[in-house]
């Protein structure tokens, strides 16, 4: 599912409806995929462990799957998840009504809906070069409505002229949130590319999160066709840095080879370091829709138990 045009959509209910449709479609699709059986566990069950009360085993589900699952109860909260979303200027690329920020908001809302369905707790942090919002993780319906309202308002705000300070934001989040949380970051990692120092600062912040016993998933949100593959018409362009306002005039055919090589090298460097520090780095091409994001979360959630 692609990102949705929000020009005429203004209420909390529209984002919730989108999230519901995405999650229900995803869960339905699991029955036709290698993840068959996970969807039921995600919604209302968890895998049975030795020592669990046998009265809570769902024997009908056992008959279907040949696996033991316990029914979840309303008060159960097994996971605390903090969503950290980059809302700086570069996230408004490539266009006002279909950009990385809209994709990130809709993807995060879908994950929140899934977490609520699992009765897990979730919070939200929004940042540019500073923390704009930090809401702690809760699992109530009222809390979900509050966060969805915050995200809806963000969808309709005009573009901000703000640079990114991802490293500082992650340092603050590491100290503000409950220990042993799952931290899910949506960012284009724009400012980590500007220098080696910025890249090092980014990984210092990730290590801070790991030191505080958090698990970390970074969704590197991109418009792959343009930002990675540099697929533009072969003609002169004026490119504008969305965070600094700096401009440069180039003929795309003359710079494409060097540009794609530099981007590929940088992405490989980030991937290797994330693997070294046991950080889950996931490419999130906004043109691929939300299901890859949900599937990556599902895999991570299964590893966490």
What is each stretch, according to the model?
Residues 1-28, 47-52, 61, 70-106, ...:
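Exposed, interaction-prone extracellular/peripheral surfaces
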Residues 42:
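Short hydrophobic/aromatic beta-strand or adjacent loop that forms the aromatic wall/cage
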């Amino acid at each position: 599912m692609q990102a949705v045009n929000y020009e005429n959509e203004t209420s909390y209910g529209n984002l919730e409806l989108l999230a519901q449709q995405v999650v229900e479609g995803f869960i339905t699709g699991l029955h036709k995929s290698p993840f068959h059986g996970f969807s039921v566990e995600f919604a209302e069950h968890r895998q049975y462990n030795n020592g669990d009360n046998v009265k809570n085993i769902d024997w009908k589900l056992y008959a279907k799957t040949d696996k033991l699952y316990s029914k979840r109860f309303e008060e159960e909260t097994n996971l605390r998840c903090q969503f950290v979303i980059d809302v700086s200027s570069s996230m408004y690329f490539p266009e006002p009504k279909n950009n990385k920020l809209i994709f990130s908001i809709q993807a995060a809302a879908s994950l929140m809906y899934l977490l609520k369905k699992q009765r897990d707790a979730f919070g939200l942090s929004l940042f540019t070069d500073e923390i704009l919002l930090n809401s702690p993780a809760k699992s109530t319906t009222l809390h979900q409505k509050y966060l969805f309202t915050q995200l809806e308002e963000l969808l309709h705000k005009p573009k901000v002229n703000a640079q990114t300070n991802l490293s500082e934001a992650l340092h603050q989040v590491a100290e503000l949130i409950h220990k042993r949380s799952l931290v899910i970051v949506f960012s284009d990692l724009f400012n980590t590319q500007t220098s080696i120092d910025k890249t090092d600062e980014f990984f210092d912040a990730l290590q801070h999160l790991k030191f505080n016993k958090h698990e970390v998933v970074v969704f590197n949100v991109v418009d792959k066709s343009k930002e990675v593959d540099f697929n533009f018409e072969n003609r002169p362009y004026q490119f504008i840095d969305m965070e600094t306002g700096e401009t440069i005039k180039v003929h795309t055919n003359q710079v494409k080879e060097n540009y794609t090589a530099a981007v590929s090298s940088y992405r490989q460097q980030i991937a290797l370091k994330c693997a070294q520090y046991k950080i889950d780095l996931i490419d999130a091409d906004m043109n691929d829709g939300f299901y890859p994001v949900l599937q990556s979360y599902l895999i991570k959630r299964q590893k966490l138990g």
